[in-house]
A protein has these predicted regions:
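Active-site beta-loop-alpha junctions enriched in small/polar residues
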Residues: 50-54, 102-104, 131-135, 165
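Histidine/acidic residue-rich metal-binding segments in metalloenzymes
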Residues: 1-96, 105-123, 140-159
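Active-site neighborhood of phospho(di)ester-bond hydrolases with catalytic His/Asp-centered motifs
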Residues: 129, 160-162
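Short, contiguous acidic/charged loop-to-helix segments that flank catalytic cores in large enzymes
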Residues: 67-74, 131-136, 167
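Short catalytic-loop micro-motif centered on adjacent basic/acidic residues
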Residues: 96-100, 128
Length: 171
C-alpha cells in the first residue's frame, strides 16, 4: 500500500534499518511508479537485464563500485518480468518498452516475452533490444537477431545502437 511504501521511505531517509523484504517492496513500488510516469508522458522505458555487478570484493574495496568487475548473471527473470509487464498492461499503463539482456541464454525468453504484450496501439510497442555490453560483438549480435527473427518480427526491430553499429566494420 502507499502507506507501507511511505513508512519504508521514512525509514530509509532517517537511516533506520530496513529489511531486505522492505527494500524489495520499495524498489518494486518505485519501478511501477516510474513505469506509470513513462506511460503518462508517452516515453519509452528501457530495461537492461542480467548484469552481476561488482564481483571482486577485494578490488571493490580498493577501487570502488563499477570499476570493471562485472559479469553475466543468471537470474530468474521470466516470472517477475511477466508479472511486472502484466500489472502495467492490465491497467492500460504499459509504455513502449525495450528489453535488453546480458545473458545469451535469455534471448528466446525475452524475444517471446515481448510478443505477450503487443497490443496493436503502437507498432513494435514491445521490443527485444539489441545486444549490449558483453554481447556487443559479432556472435552476440547474431544470436540476438536470430532469436528475434525466429520468435518475432525483425522488421519491427528498433535497431542497433551505440557501439553495436560498428558490426558493419567487422571482417
Amino acid at each position: 500500500t502507499e502507506e507501507q511504501i511511505a513508512k519504508i521511505f521514512g525509514q530509509l531517509i532517517s537511516g533506520a534499518h530496513v529489511s531486505d523484504h522492505e527494500k524489495w517492496q520499495f524498489k518494486s513500488a518505485m519501478l511501477v511508479y516510474f513505469a506509470h510516469l513513462d506511460h503518462e508522458k508517452g516515453w519509452t522505458q528501457q530495461f537492461h537485464l542480467g548484469a552481476l555487478r561488482n564481483n571482486n570484493a577485494r578490488l571493490l574495496g580498493s577501487l570502488g563500485p563499477d570499476t570493471g568487475f562485472d559479469s553475466i548473471g543468471d537470474f530468474e527473470q521470466a516470472k517477475p518480468l511477466s508479472k511486472f509487464l502484466n500489472h502495467l498492461d492490465s491497467t492500460n499503463q504499459l509504455a513502449k518498452t525495450i528489453l535488453y539482456n546480458l545473458n545469451p541464454g535469455d534471448n528466446e525468453l525475452l524475444a517471446t516475452m515481448t510478443g505477450n504484450f503487443q497490443d496493436g496501439t503502437i507498432v513494435g510497442k514491445m521490443q527485444f533490444g539489441s545486444s549490449w555490453w558483453f554481447l556487443d560483438q559479432k556472435d552476440g549480435m547474431e544470436s540476438q537477431m536470430n532469436a528475434l527473427s525466429n520468435m518475432g518480427l525483425l522488421s519491427h526491430f528498433v535497431g542497433m545502437l551505440t557501439d553495436s553499429r560498428s558490426f558493419l566494420s567487422f571482417p
